[in-house]
């Protein structure tokens, strides 16, 4: 099964953008992030799972994703939900996690500008998303200046599991009962072409 859980997030051109990138790095943006360590390294239910914040001028998508074993679909959804909720309050970003995220984001910068095309793309992002002209000049310093308190203040504003829409692609006969047991809300069925099926016809597929 392939699991997605997402909701809207602020535009890229917002004062918290660098903090958002850092928080996402801890939650699901890297191999050592919480979501991947949980589902891949601990549970062994997925080859790779995480979270993404897409870039956009307006409201954009924040989502968790997890391709998992069919027989662990329900359990994986539960773990994803736990991670989304935990970082908001019960399990805030630790000092070690913040330090690792800061290192990951800043040390990656030289590799992102190895070619003229890459440099041009970064300059294009400034124009495309309405970022400050000094966005990349000050990026590393702003990442390094973030504190655990910044992460704790941002997490409940960025990560909103109660507003998430869940999308699960898989063998319905094997996963539907478990998903229903989670009581996440109304279930809609979508065919391979993206069409929402009426309840009557969905029942036979």
Regions found by a protein language model. Name each.
Residues 1-11, 20-24, 36-89, 95-148, ...:
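M16 family metallopeptidases and their MPP-like homologs
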Residues 33:
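Conserved active-site loop region of the serine DD-peptidase/beta-lactamase
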Residues 122-123, 171-175, 179:
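Detector for C-terminal structural segments
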Residues 189-205:
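Compositionally biased, proline/threonine/alanine/serine-rich low-complexity intrinsically disordered stretches
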């Amino acid at each position: 099964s392939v699991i997605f859980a997402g909701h809207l997030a602020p535009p890229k051109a917002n004062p918290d953008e660098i903090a958002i990138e850092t928080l996402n790095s801890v939650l699901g943006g890297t191999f050592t992030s919480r979501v991947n360590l949980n589902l891949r390294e601990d549970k062994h239910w997925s080859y790779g799972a995480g979270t993404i914040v897409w870039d956009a001028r307006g409201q954009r998508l924040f989502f968790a994703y997890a391709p998992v074993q069919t027989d662990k679909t329900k359990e994986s959804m539960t773990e994803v939900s736990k991670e989304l909720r935990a970082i908001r309050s019960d399990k805030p970003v630790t000092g070690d996690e913040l330090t690792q995220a800061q290192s990951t984001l800043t040390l990656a910068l030289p590799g992102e500008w190895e070619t003229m095309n890459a440099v041009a793309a970064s300059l294009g992002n400034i124009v495309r998303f309405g970022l400050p002209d000094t966005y990349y000049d000050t990026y590393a310093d702003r990442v390094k200046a973030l504190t655990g308190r910044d992460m704790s203040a941002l997490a409940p504003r960025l990560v909103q599991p109660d507003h998430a829409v869940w999308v699960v692609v898989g063998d319905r006969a094997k996963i539907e009962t478990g998903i229903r047991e989670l009581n996440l809300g109304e279930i809609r069925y979508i065919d391979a072409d993206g069409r929402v099926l009426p309840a009557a016809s969905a029942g036979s597929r």
